[in-house]
């Protein structure tokens, strides 16, 4: 397993990953936002490879005031769920944040399908928005304590 910074050559693989998680985990309306995000130059985003393939991606960003870091677009290809890739990529991102932005709050938003995963790493639910991502996909705002 290896993790490296995202490069535009990874674009199609990342699109395949988000599509594999739609509609259960990702509302189709989010695809255009994700594509726009991947095209930006001001992001910190990583890709994770198993022995052969790109199987996960995720990053983070600093909010405009610099008061908090927000995890962004953490995705594991649906064929590779529950194999530890999401955990490894999350730990990598959290360590990267700790080294670059010590003592900065870490926030994220996720759905009812994955919030318990983040609770295992110390995140706490701050707010739940019913259908926050789309019909049947509730938005859970979380913070790392």
Feature roles, as predicted:
Residues 1-32, 49:
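Short amphipathic alpha-helix that is part of the acyltransferase structural core
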Residues 36-42:
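Short loop/turn motifs at secondary-structure junctions and domain boundaries
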Residues 43-47, 57, 73, 107, ...:
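Short hydrophobic/aromatic beta-strand element in the GNAT-like acyltransferase core
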Residues 47, 53-62, 68-75:
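Conserved beta-strand in the GNAT
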Residues 77, 81, 111:
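Residue-level recognition of the GNAT/N-acetyltransferase active site
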Residues 80, 84-92:
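Conserved acetyl-CoA pyrophosphate-binding loop and the N-cap/start of the following alpha-helix
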Residues 105-109, 119, 124-141:
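Conserved catalytic-core motifs of GNAT/GCN5-like acyltransferases
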């Amino acid at each position: 397993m290896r993790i490296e910074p995202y490069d535009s050559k990874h674009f199609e693989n990342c699109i395949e990953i988000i599509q594999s998680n739609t509609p259960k985990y990702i509302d189709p309306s989010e695809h255009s936002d994700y594509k726009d995000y991947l095209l930006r130059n001001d992001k910190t985003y990583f890709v994770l490879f198993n022995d052969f393939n790109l199987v996960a991606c995720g990053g983070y960003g600093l909010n405009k005031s610099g008061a908090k870091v927000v995890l962004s677009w953490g995705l594991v290809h649906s064929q590779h769920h529950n194999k530890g890739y999401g955990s490894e990529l999350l730990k990598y991102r959290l360590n990267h944040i700790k080294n670059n932005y010590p003592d900065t709050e870490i926030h994220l938003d996720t759905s009812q399908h994955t919030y318990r995963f983040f609770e295992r790493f110390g995140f706490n639910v701050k707010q739940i928005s019913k259908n926050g991502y789309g019909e049947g996909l509730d938005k859970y705002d979380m913070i790392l304590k």
